[in-house]
Swiss-Prot record:
GO terms for molecular function: glutamate-gated receptor activity; kainate selective glutamate receptor activity; ligand-gated monoatomic ion channel activity involved in regulation of presynaptic membrane potential; transmitter-gated monoatomic ion channel activity involved in regulation of postsynaptic membrane potential. Strong expression in hippocampal CA3 pyramidal cells. Low expression in hippocampal dentate granule cells, in layers II, V and VI of the cortex, and in cerebellar Purkinje cells. No expression in the striatum, reticular thalamus, hypothalamus or amygdaloid complex. This is Glutamate receptor ionotropic, kainate 4. The keyword Transferase does not apply. CDD domains: PBP2_iGluR_kainate_KA1 (cd13724). It holds the Pfam family Lig_chan-Glu_bd. The gene is Grik4. The keyword Flavoprotein does not apply. Homodimer. Can form functional heteromeric receptors with GRIK1, GRIK2 and GRIK3. The chain crosses the membrane at residues 546-566, 624-644, 805-825. Residues 21-545, 645-804 are extracellular. InterPro entries: ANF_lig-bd_rcpt, Glu/Gly-bd, Iono_Glu_rcpt_met, Ionotropic_Glu_rcpt, Iontro_rcpt_C, Peripla_BP_I.
Length: 956
């Protein structure tokens, strides 16, 4: 059988074929609240009837008639009596009532016996135990669907803990789907039932003490509003509580009495405000209330009135479709007879196939007579009323608009005043010097005050700074409560906690934190002991005594090796007569013992020496020594600068292990702070030992504030364990304080909020924005820097030890060994190619070593063959005289005097040819050079000390 579909605006000519009465189609409506100033049900039925009868498409003169019967109380007897009055009138359907479950059950049974369709407009009661009649249809959404929708919302918000307030015991059966989900997910759902006094105050106090932030209320609209008003009196209507109402009429209640418009209230609605008749329908009801009532009871049409309006249209649509297939007739029935309406079953089949768009959305029924294929709108309370943030569809499930929800949170911060709890702590929050003349937030200054101003500018909120009552950050007590700022957040006495509040796992369990705005760690603060005053020999401090000793040994070793190598290598022995190469029997070595000791000194002082090494071995010794001195002098200069610019200070401990391994220096931290919790919960052996010491030490080593800890450090032998940021701040302002070692851990400061705060994401984004813009770093430099002590990485300069520069000593030793080896190779090579073949290698080696050990003179004769004569100098080839020549006296002989020039050249050439040792002819420029010789008193005639006098460059 095809589905019956018809719009409410168009009704074809169905009124032509009504057998029993060609002039009317009668419907009965039972109202249990028929007053004009209540729901407006009577008016809604009248509006539906008049709109149908005024339809221009209606053919014929038949009209829809709706007989209204009043039910003054929910009584089975009165309900049965009313039905006995309705049946003789020959009605095609019975509508209502809207709020009498017992009466509705009696009506369904009677209509089922007589096969007369019955439309319910109230939520189901006792779903598990009541059998739905075939003739009964319910336009109201089922409680099962509502419970599934609530479960979807809880999943969307990741809610694992909630409380359900029930006005009746039947709510556990009605919300079975919701309870089943909590059982499956193992989340926590506490159920609280209103007692006979109907006072929700005790229940709300229990919920507040349990710190439950999500509250589900399953009650009628009036009771739901009462619960919310009581919650407002207890301070539970704020941004940290979420209320979900299952009643579909709750959004029609007035919220003028709610002071805090940041409260997160969610509800459902089924109204179709886009319907063509919805605005006219609402205006008609509102006008009726204004004319007949002292006040308007609802902000919009009641749900029951809209459902009755849609029920009239559903009946008319089904009768129209049925009348097209067969002629129907309605005859009077009686309670006393067993007679039934013969067309009732057919009409019910057509009613189950009805599809139309009504004031309450899409109208369609399933095989059980329950409404299907519809959507529940999810509404959220704002300062401008409720607005839709999503919907739940029977077939498609939950669909939330996250953008609308997030924008509502941002809008709720706009121009909202937040209570900020904090604590006086330099430099985070301080009182101004003239704070007595100020009031409010103007009395305070510091890093946190400036950060609050930046956040307020971004998020557009106002704030009120309030100092915490007990002056502590917050620690758990034995009874489970918390002190300090954490306790105020748990009690919802404050919206934010802005201070040096450390993010810890224990605090994260009871409050929410924003992203960290500052990263830090625990450090050790201790006072420094001034070292001795600089002495006359403080210039020796850059190197440790061991380094100075090794440098002296290195100098002696280089001098000895240089003396040895220079004696061994033949390339350091040279003729002192430049003009008598090959003929002079004497060779000279410039590296005497004195010169060998002086040459390293000149290199070390970077002044050089007139002695130039000739052999490769001696040059190797010189190179490694110069490299050694380069590193040594550079290191000394750098470390000496540190000693001259930084005053040396001494501390008896260098690390946390040194502190833990001694008992002479007391150490402690702030009582009730995160540092104390860190040591208390640490599993590291060193930190456990430190905690046992601090916990058992008497008198107590814990302090109440940072200022007290600083004073104790300066006035006694005490080390203070505190955050590195505070350590840095106080070291900038007191040069007698120093940090020992590095950080003991890594953590961060965050903004504390109550659990479930809707502002958490907004503050996270704002903090990230400040970090990206470098604003937080700028604020930190503003409040941390500017002290009288310069910032130093380590104010205790130390002399360099062998572990720092030992490598250059290794290089020096290796170079010396290589030089000795090369000198021996040079000695052997020259000896093998010498003219004296009768002398053995060992004999020559022993002779040289004996000369080195005895420090003999650095002159010895040239080695010659046995019996050989000194070589004769070659005869100079006569050359033609040049046009000009330079004489030994420096005079020039030009071309104008050729005879004189030729005569002079011939004389000097003859002298050179006879072996004269005081005249030399340069083969390149043909210049004569004179050499004067004087006999040495200590040597033979061949042992001469030559003094060269020349008026030109050095000889060859």
């Amino acid at each position: 059988m095809p589905r019956v579909s018809a719009p409410l605006v168009l009704l074809p000519a169905w009124l032509l074929m009504v057998a029993c009465s060609p002039h009317s189609l009668r419907i009965a409506a039972i109202l249990d609240d028929p007053m004009e100033c209540s729901r407006g049900e009577r008016l809604s039925i009248t509006l539906a009837k008049n709109r149908i009868n005024r339809a221009p498409e209606r053919l014929g003169k038949a009209k829809v008639e709706v007989d209204i019967f009043e039910l003054l109380r929910d009584s089975e007897y009165e309900t049965a009596e009313t039905m006995c009055q309705i049946l003789p009138k020959g009605v095609v359907a019975v509508l209502g009532p809207s709020s009498s479950p017992a009466s509705s059950s009696i009506i369904s049974n009677i209509c089922g016996e007589k096969e007369v369709p019955h439309f319910k407009v109230a939520p189901e009661e006792f779903v598990r135990f009541q059998l739905q009649r075939f003739t009964t249809l319910n336009l109201h959404p089922s409680n099962t669907d509502i419970s599934v929708a609530v479960a979807g919302i809880l999943n969307f918000f990741n809610c694992t803990t909630a409380c359900l307030i029930c006005a009746k015991a039947e709510c556990l059966l009605n919300l079975e789907k919701l309870l089943r989900q909590f059982l499956i997910s193992k989340d926590t759902l506490s159920v609280r039932m209103l007692d006979d006094t109907r006072d929700p105050t005790p229940l709300l106090k229990e919920i507040r003490d349990d710190k439950t932030a999500t509250i589900i209320i399953h009650a009628n609209a009036s009771m739901s509003h009462t619960i919310l008003l009581k919650a407002a009196e207890l301070g539970m209507v704020s941004a940290y509580y979420t209320y979900i109402f299952t009643n579909l009429e709750f959004s029609l209640q007035r919220m003028d009495s709610l002071v805090d418009d940041r409260v997160n209230i969610l509800g459902f609605s089924i109204f179709n405000q886009s319907h063509a008749f919805f605005q006219e329908f609402s205006q008609s009801l509102n006008q009726s209330w204004q004319e007949n009532c002292d006040h308007v009871p609802f902000t919009g049409p009641a749900l029951s009135s809209a459902l009755l309006f849609d029920a009239v249209y559903a009946v008319v649509t089904a009768v129209q479709e049925l009348n097209r297939s067969q002629e129907i007739g309605v005859k009077p029935l009686s309670c006393g007879s067993a007679q039934i309406w013969q067309h009732g079953t057919s009409l019910m089949n057509y009613l189950r196939m009805v599809e139309l768009e009504g004031l309450t959305g899409h109208i369609e029924f399933n095989s059980k007579g329950q409404r299907s294929n519809y959507a529940l709108k999810i509404l959220q309370f704002t300062r401008n009323g409720f607005r839709q943030i999503g919907q739940w569809h029977v077939a498609e499930g939950l669909s939330m608009d996250s953008r609308l929800y997030a924008s509502n949170i941002s809008d709720s911060l706009f121009n909202t005043t937040l209570v900020v709890t904090t604590i006086l702590e330099n430099p985070y929050l301080m009182l101004k010097g003239n704070h007595q003349d100020m009031e409010g937030n103007d009395r305070y200054e510091g890093f946190c005050v400036d950060m609050l101003k930046e956040l307020a500018e971004i998020l557009r909120f106002n704030y009120k700074i309030r100092l915490v009552g007990d002056g502590v950050y917050g620690v758990p007590e034995a009874n489970g409560t918390w002190t300090g700022m954490v306790g105020e957040l748990i009690a919802r006495k404050a919206d934010l906690a802005v201070a040096g509040l450390t993010i810890t796992a224990e605090r994260e369990k009871v409050i929410d934190f924003s992203k960290p705005f500052m990263t830090l760690g625990i450090s050790i603060l201790y006072r420094v002991h001034m070292g001795r005053r600089p002495g006359y020999f403080s210039s020796l401090d850059p190197f440790s005594p061991g380094v100075w000793l090794f440098m002296l040994l290195a100098y002696l070793a280089v001098s000895c090796v240089l003396f040895l190598v220079a004696r061994l290598t033949p390339y350091e022995w040279y003729s002192p007569h430049p003009c008598a190469q090959g003929r002079c029997n004497l060779l000279v070595n410039q590296y005497s013992l004195g010169n060998s000791l002086w040459f390293p000194v000149g290199g070390f002082m970077q002044q050089g020496s007139t002695i130039a090494p000739r052999a490769l071995s001696t040059r190797c010794v010189s190179g490694v020594w110069w490299a050694f001195t380069l590193i040594i002098i550079s290191s000394y200069t750098a470390n000496l600068a540190a000693f001259l610019t930084v005053q040396r200070m001494e501390v008896p401990i260098e690390s946390v292990d040194d502190l833990a391994d001694q008992t002479a220096i007391e150490y402690g931290t702030i009582h009730g702070g995160s540092s104390m919790t860190f040591f208390q919960n640490s599993r590291y052996q060193t930190y456990q030992r430190m905690w046992n010491y601090m916990y058992s030490k008497q008198p107590s080593v814990f302090v109440k504030s940072t200022e007290e800890g600083i004073a104790r450090v300066l006035n006694s032998n005490y080390a203070f364990l505190l955050e590195s940021t505070m350590n840095e701040y106080y070291r900038q302002r007191n040069c007698n304080l120093t940090q020992i070692g590095g950080l003991l851990d890594t953590k961060g400061y965050g903004i504390g909020m109550p659990v479930g705060s809707v502002f958490r994401d907004e503050f996270d984004l704002a903090i990230l924005q400040l970090q990206e813009n470098n604003r937080l770093e700028i604020l930190k430099r503003k409040w941390w820097e500017g002290g009288k002590c310069p910032k130093e990485e380590d104010h205790r300069a130390k002399g360099l030890g062998m572990e720092n520069i030992g490598g250059i000593f290794v290089v020096l030793i290796c170079g010396l060994i290589v030089a000795i080896f090369m000198a021996m190779l040079e000695f052997l090579w020259t000896l093998r190619h010498s003219e004296a073949s009768e002398v053995s290698v060992c004999q020559e080696m022993m002779t040289e070593l004996r000369s080195i050990i005895l420090c003999q003179d650095n002159i010895h004769p040239r080695r010659r063959r046995s019996g050989g004569l000194p070589p004769q100098p070659p005869v100079l080839e006569e050359r033609r005289p040049r046009g000009t020549a330079t004489l030994s006296n420096g005079k020039l002989c030009g071309a104008g005097e050729p005879d004189q020039l030729a005569q002079r050249l011939a004389q000097e050439a003859a002298l050179v040819a006879r072996g004269c040792t005081h005249i030399r002819v340069c083969p390149e420029c043909r210049r004569f050079q004179g050499l004067r010789a004087r006999p040495s008193p200590a040597r033979s005639e061949e042992s001469l000390e030559w003094d060269k006098t020349t008026n030109s460059s050095e000889p060859e």
